[in-house]
Swiss-Prot record:
Domain of life of the source: Bacteria
Species the sequence originates in: Treponema pallidum (strain Nichols)
Family from the record: Belongs to the bacterial ribosomal protein bL36 family.
GO biological process, one term: translation
Classification via Pfam families: Ribosomal_L36
The protein, known as: Large ribosomal subunit protein bL36
Signal peptide start and end residues: none
SUPFAM superfamilies associated with the record: Ribosomal protein L36 (SSF57840)
Matching InterPro entries: Ribosomal_bL36, Ribosomal_bL36_sp
Length: 37
């Protein structure tokens, strides 16, 4: 999980999800996991 100020979709399988005001990226590739902080 990478915590970044700007969350970007890296590949086709990345999905942007907003949960409780936190923007996340969920992907098949665990390296692509991100969270805005």
């Amino acid at each position: 999980m990478k915590i970044r100020t700007s969350v970007k979709v890296i590949c086709d399988k990345c999905k942007l999800i907003k949960r409780f005001g936190i923007i996340r990226v969920i992907c098949v590739n665990p390296k692509h996991k991100q969270r805005q902080g």
